[in-house]
Structures are given as C-alpha cells and as structure tokens.
Amino acid sequence: MDYNNFTSPLDPTVKLKAKEEEALTDPTYYRKLVGKLNFLTNTRLDIAYSVQNLSQFMDDTRQPHLKPVFHLLRYLKTDPTLGIFMSRDTNYTLRAYCDSDWAVCPDSRNSISGYHVLLGSSSVSWKSKKHATISLSSAEVEYRALRKVVGELVWLSRLFEELTVLFPKPIVVFCDS
C-alpha cells in the first residue's frame, strides 16, 4: 500500500450515513479499532474530529464505515512522529481557534463545532463535538462554538493565574464566519 498520499485523516468527499448498505456481521473489529483510535486522540489532536465522526456508528456498523477507519490508519502511518509536545518557548500568549460546520450530518442535520486553544505554540485544550440540537442558521452554530471556546478560555485563564503562569491579555479568539 502507498501511504504517502494520505494528507488528511478523513477523505473530505466522503459523507457517512447511518443506514447505508449491509450491516457488518461482527462489528467487534470496528469497535476495537475506533476505541483504540479514541485513546490515541489524547496525543494526536489532528484525528479528534475523525474519530468522533467514526464513533457515531459503533452501535450499527455498516460496510462503508470500515473504509474511513483504514484511511485514518494509513494517515497515521504517514508520520508517526506527530503528537502533542510542549515547546520550550517562553511565549505564553493564549489564543484560540474555533470552527463550525452547519447541518453537516446527513442523517440528523445536526452541526459540529470544535476549538483548539494554544499557550504559545503548544496545544493545551481542544474539542470537537456534534450538537444535540438542530441549529436554524450557520450564525447560530458559530455563536455556539464561540460560547464554548470562551468558557474554556475563562477556565484556563483562571487555572493559569492560580499556577502563576502569566500571559498577555486580552486573549485572541479566531473564528471563521
């Protein structure tokens, strides 16, 4: 297999659906793989969204759900040295990035939001989550994402102040529109 051409954790053209094609006769293999990938998200931030996406199909795994798992494994094989490392850099600027995808789920039309918080050049917090309710507009989804990341930043800033880690204020949050 050629592992050099996998530059993203999931194929962006593939949209997985819940009830397509035939169910796997034994979904144990799929569940074990996704469970191990879920554990790996503790150190591989780049696969968090992909694993969250694949985890939705644990209870009713179908044949098309296996291909993205193997794609993700091949992506991991491309550069096994990637991970989360704390930089020695003394730049303690706290900044955050957030993004949302409105009505992305083809089955439920629910949206997905995520954020990534950095202290200097080191990742300190991240999250990717499918919303429990349907949003009426993309603006509503973006505001929800901003609310989540600001809540996380308030918590982190209080934690860092308690640990006497000084960082410049105000904290910058980057969000697309």
Protein language model annotation of sequence segments:
Residues 1-177:
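Long, low-complexity, charge-biased intrinsically disordered regions
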